[in-house]
Regions:
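Residue-level preference for long, well-ordered alpha-helices that form the structural scaffold
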Residues: 61-64, 120-124, 173-177, 197
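Active-site acidic catalytic loop and adjacent metal/ATP-binding pocket
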Residues: 31-34, 130-168
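Surface-exposed, interaction-prone regions with an acidic/low-complexity signature
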Residues: 1-6, 10, 38-51, 60-64, ...
């Protein structure tokens, strides 16, 4: 089977109504799940709108598929395990209008599935925060770092996904640090986790702040 031909079909709007549509974020980011030759693929389709659309057109921002690959190279350099893309394509309809797709293979189960019995996997959850610290020390920050955005691969290793939510910054203001920590706390404040797990997360986030020496 010609995989590229299959992947390109996901530029078609008709696919939004297909059973393969896994998640849809107001048609701006759509995730499809497709099995090809006994392998599971996730096809992400990005359609920029508004300010992002104009910024990409004028070269002020990277297309999100290209940004994923940009962050992927950064993670390779610092030795952080993540799901690599196997295919990407940008389709331009006009100077402003465009869409892109990025394809990854199935990378494992979400770490979130293990939060109810986290004590049995305590080292993985500590590693989750260790990775956050390592990213920040290398100028890489995530505004949506959560247990659903990291997988456990078939080797039992933590593996990052959703790299389009990661950013690089040279200078970090105190205000932005506060924002990052507030967003990190959402992983337990916006979920139905146990009190014990919530206390564990609070303790680990305090460790994050201390190790990064963030005066917030």
């Amino acid at each position: 089977m010609n995989k590229e031909k299959v992947f390109l079909e996901y530029f078609n709007k008709e696919k939004l109504n297909s059973e393969e549509c896994f998640k849809n974020y107001k048609d701006r980011k759509v995730i499809f799940k497709k099995e090809i030759d006994r392998k599971i693929y996730f096809i992400k389709k990005y359609v920029p709108y508004g300010k992002r659309e104009k910024a990409i057109a004028f070269g002020l921002q990277r297309d999100r598929a290209k940004h994923y690959e940009y962050i992927s190279k950064k993670l390779d350099k610092i030795g952080i395990q993540h799901v690599h893309s196997v295919y990407s394509k940008i389709k331009r309809y006009s100077f402003f209008k465009r869409a892109s797709i990025l394809v990854t293979e199935y990378g494992g189960e979400e770490l979130a599935k293990y939060s109810k019995n986290y004590m049995e996997h305590i080292e993985l959850f500590k590693k989750f925060f260790d990775i956050y610290i390592k990213l920040a020390k290398n100028g890489i920050y995530c505004t949506d770092y959560n247990l659903g955005g990291i997988l456990i691969n078939n080797k039992g290793e933590l593996t990052l996904i959703d790299l389009d939510a990661y950013k690089t910054k040279i200078i970090l203001t105190k205000q932005y640090k506060r924002k990052l920590i507030t967003l990190l706390r959402k992983m337990y404040t916006h979920s139905n986790e146990t009190q014990e797990f919530e206390e564990f997360c609070k303790s680990e986030i305090e460790r994050v702040i201390k190790e990064l020496n963030w005066k917030i």
